[in-house]
A protein has these predicted regions:
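Domain-level signature for soluble enzymes in the chorismate/prephenate branch of the shikimate pathway
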Residues: 1-178
Length: 178
């Protein structure tokens, strides 16, 4: 398809949270809901920040209680909006990637290892387009106290898998040796 979940800077919902500056972090809990975000964080920590904390794979929601002292945590999604109110420091991975590479970032894309019919791709693309054309209605009918969803869905995230995002995705995958 022609769609993804991407950002061209601040993602707002994919962040490393801590009570101390980066260089003082000793341990990092890794969110269990996104392999892409985990791999992005590992790369940024090693290649850009030059920090090598102990990495702990979170297995459930309880890990957020451990984000204190020199223990940090990668938190994604709605939980990241909650965590913003609790943590002293947060580092947005979309922002960091953009600073390092100058490229957008693709957190998720719909892929298939089998050929898809052109009818399916058209229906899929049409369904995505319907959703994008109704963001205002979606936001209005789902109040959310923690963050401005209109801003989130229209400024922080973007959804078209254009050439620049394909380039960014291929670059990220090459860094992972996949």
């Amino acid at each position: 398809g022609d769609y993804c979940i991407g950002t061209d800077g601040e993602a707002a919902s994919v962040c490393l949270f801590s009570e101390v500056p980066l260089k003082e972090i000793k341990r990092v809990y890794l969110d269990y809901q996104s392999r892409t975000s985990v791999e992005l964080l590992k790369w940024i920590m090693k290649e850009y920040w030059g920090i090598y904390p102990e990495l702990i794979e979170a297995i459930n929601e309880d890990y957020r209680k451990e984000i204190k002292g020199t223990t940090a945590g990668l938190v994604i999604g709605d939980r990241a909006f909650e965590q913003r109110k609790l943590s002293t420091f947060f580092y947005d991975l979309g922002t960091e990637w953009k600073k390092i590479t100058g490229l957008p970032f693709v957190f998720a894309a719909w892929v298939s290892n089998k050929p898809l019919s052109s009818d399916f791709v058209k229906i899929f693309n049409d369904a995505n387009e319907v959703g994008l054309n109704h963001i205002e209605e979606i936001v209005s009918s789902h109040p959310f106290d923690l963050y401005d969803l209109r801003k989130y869905y229209t400024l922080h995230l973007n959804y078209r898998l254009d050439e620049k995002k394909k380039q960014a995705l291929n670059y990220f995958l090459s860094l992972q040796n996949l």
